[in-house]
A protein has these predicted regions:
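Nucleotide/phosphate-binding catalytic cleft detector across ATP-hydrolyzing
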Residues: 1-119, 127-247, 254-300
């Protein structure tokens, strides 16, 4: 019937467990809208969760939405249209690295350079921010989802065990690492249950963080190279500020064990992980929403 029955965490619980009458949809892929109608319905669902007032007056809302800094005009237009269809009255867009910087507590209007690396699910956003604007940026479609896909592929190839996307994500959370030597911070092995790819018999496979670090190596290297390429395009004065202030990591990908150390060793600049990396973009967008007049230049 194309009627929405769940959104957000509740829908995620159903993912890969549905029958023919229920579809689970990810409206966003690679940081951009993949399914316009589903995206609009998702926004309506999320608004309903927040706005639990009387149904008589449908709220006309002011919204701030984070978008990848590498978005094309068409992609930005799609986000704006989706929000307006879902009853957004004043729709403002903010680039995700800018929102992350505000959420981390950086003074984005200061005349000094700060670099943010925001590793989300679909895209990694790297931006140098100064005087309330983005001076140089690099947006790549390599991020958390790719790490999950790497693990799925590795388990199938190396251990002959079929794992779902959700199980691969659990492996990433429990034993994911960017380094093969974590010393005292090494997590315990994680036992993966799944069917054998060939015989379909049940299997139990213990997985250690070292093998996952090997399997994620290529994708992490792509993120490393993207950071280096953004630094190459940074004006020397701002570069000096970045060396002094360090580089901030935000987004779910920042939680990958040893990522900050690996990047630091490779690039020779200190890396800091945001206090609550998963929510720094949302926090920043919330602060921007309360200060629309002050941050008017951030919105597009």
């Amino acid at each position: 019937t194309d009627k929405m029955i769940a959104v957000g965490e509740k829908a995620k619980m159903m993912y890969e467990k549905t029958h023919d009458n229920i579809r689970t949809i990810r409206p966003l892929r690679d940081g951009v809208i993949a399914d316009f109608t589903a995206c609009e319905q998702m926004m309506r669902g999320l608004i309903k969760m927040v706005h639990t007032g009387s149904r008589l007056f449908s709220p006309s809302l002011r919204m701030v939405i984070g978008v990848p800094s590498g978005s094309t005009e068409v992609e930005l237009r799609a986000v704006r249209d989706s929000a307006e269809h879902a009853d957004g009255r004043d729709v403002y867009l903010i680039f995700e690295p800018m929102a992350a910087a505000i959420g981390i507590g950086i003074d984005v209007e200061a005349p000094e350079g700060n670099m943010i690396v925001d590793i989300g699910g679909g895209s990694t956003e790297i931006a140098v921010i100064s005087l309330g604007g983005i001076v140089s940026n690099n947006s790549i479609r390599t991020a958390g989802d790719d790490l999950t896909a790497d693990i799925q592929e590795y388990m199938s190839r190396q251990h002959n065990v079929k794992v779902s996307e959700r199980m691969a994500e659990r492996i990433k959370i429990h034993v994911g690492s960017a380094l093969t030597d974590l010393g005292d911070e090494a997590p315990e092995d994680f036992v993966v249950h799944g069917p054998n790819r060939i015989t379909a018999l049940p299997m139990e496979v213990p997985v250690c963080y070292q093998e996952i670090a090997h399997c994620l190596d290529k994708t992490v290297a792509k993120i490393e190279n993207a950071v280096l390429s953004a630094l190459e395009n940074t004006p020397p004065e701002l570069y000096a500020d970045i060396v002094k202030n360090g580089i901030w990591l935000s987004g779910g990908g920042a939680l990958l064990r040893g990522l900050d150390k690996r990047l630091q060793d490779k690039i020779n600049i200190p890396f800091h992980i945001a206090e609550d990396p998963l929510h720094s973009v949302a926090k920043g967008a919330g602060i921007a929403l309360k200060n629309v007049d002050r941050f008017s230049f951030l919105m597009r």
